[in-house]
Amino acid sequence: MIRFINRIHAGHLRWPYSTFWLGLFILSSMMVACTPKPVWKSYHPVSQDSYPGVHWEKADYPEQLGWSSEKLALARNFSKAIGSDGVMIVDNGIVVDAWGDISRNYQCHSMRKSILSALIGIHVEKGDIDLSATIGELGIDDRYPSLSATEKKATVGDLIMARSGVYHPALGEAASMKGMRPKRHSHAPGTFWYYNNWDFNALGTIFELETGTRIFEEFDRRVADPLQMEDFNVGNCKYLSWSDYRSAPYSIHDYYLFRMSARDLARFGLLFLRQGRWKSQQIISSEWIRESTANHSEWGQDGGYGYMWWTGIHGGLLPNVSLKAHSYLASGYGGHKLIVLPFRNLVIVHRVNTDSVGRRPMSHQIGRLLWLILSAAGEGDIGPDPSIAAAAGKKLDQTDLKRLLKNGSRWMIPNKGIFMGGRHLVISCTTDGTMLFCPYEETEFKGKWWISGDRFYFKILGLRSYFELIRNGNFITLFDATGTMFGEFEAPSI
């Protein structure tokens, strides 16, 4: 019934302008206030793989599935500390635990890319999309300065792997993405990986041209309906053009904005965990699932990238937790994560209310949350406890910090999934209080640093916070305001 009502098109209404916006405000407020409370189906142990029906099946208590309620409480408390708004944990198709607002259709941000990847996979199988076709052959271009003949040699496959070599301004770029965007024409198609919103937006254009469908409606038909998603609503999704952004670059390729609830994203994640099969129906080919979540590019020291899915190598995927291969996730601005762990038959969803101003959990914090969740599952081979409470060594006091930074300091931190960039993140602190953050050799962000008490404060990329530093032997470890490890560097003598 809810999904039927959601299909009513508000565009047919003809209200006076001011009344329309007042009504829209009241309606949206009511929708937030009336977010449906999750309905759970009672858990009944079965030997085969479980799938949700109209509602998810939930264990009466975590110990039914071999989990620790006490350790899950630690995860829940930490998620509140970092600003999480919804968490859902699914073990072999059964909900172990969930908290926060898991039925609200939050923005997906860049998780949209993994969703589009799934739709592309369906239409590659149907023969509608050819990954080897060049964007020139498909008639893809952009506003001035338009694409060169070389750029038009990029294939659809290059775009889906973020290797197009087209560095035209794009919609929806964060400040960090703009700052790290390579110079135009600096890399040939297929030769260099860069997390490129132009590629992702142009793929939306290509998808609709080649399939003759609209992205949101096609997702509703091909995925949401057969998976019996409880909250997904095409009317909540929308396209954003350059006219919707302030000071936006001139690009003809729209940003396709998905909204989805945690419990519906968990169904999408379970579909991938089950190799594209939902009960008796093969919705996405298992070959596409394997290919799209494989490592096609590498970044940092243990990060990989597939077909618009983030992957891990050497135990990586998120900072502060060690994972077995092959694990992968969809990621969106502000801390949105859909994590799929086939080695443990788990799907974990993390949501944040990015419609309002508030804390934005960072990757190293979500990695610690995942560490706590896996600890509650009884996993032992997940790396050391990344909390400051478990750290060995001496905490640097104000005198130590002043000595460390007296003549400036340069910290080279191994980039283990901390920030999209190269193998090391470099933080340089000059004597005048300037802080430089370099995720790549040729990319630099400028901020400020200062010392107050026994804390190293900083303000950069819109973030104001602090680190506490602990020295253990030849290394100094940085811990953030939540007591979570950020990274470590080889310690100079002080």
Regions found by a protein language model. Give the residues of each.
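Active-site Gly/Thr loop motif
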Residues: S243-R246, Y250, A294-I348
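N-terminal leader/targeting segments and the immediately adjacent pre-domain N-terminus
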Residues: I2-I8, T19, L24-S28, C34-I102, ...
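Lipid interaction determinants
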Residues: S387-I494
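Catalytic-site signature segments of enzymes, centered on catalytic residues
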Residues: V96-G100, G165-S241, I252-R259
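Active-site-proximal loop and beta-strand segments within enzyme catalytic domains
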Residues: D49-D60, E70-N77, R112, G121-Y195
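Active-site SXXK
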Residues: G93, Q107-S132, L159, L203-F207, ...
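Active-site-proximal alpha-helical segments within enzyme catalytic domains
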Residues: S114, A202-I206, Y256-W278, H336-N353
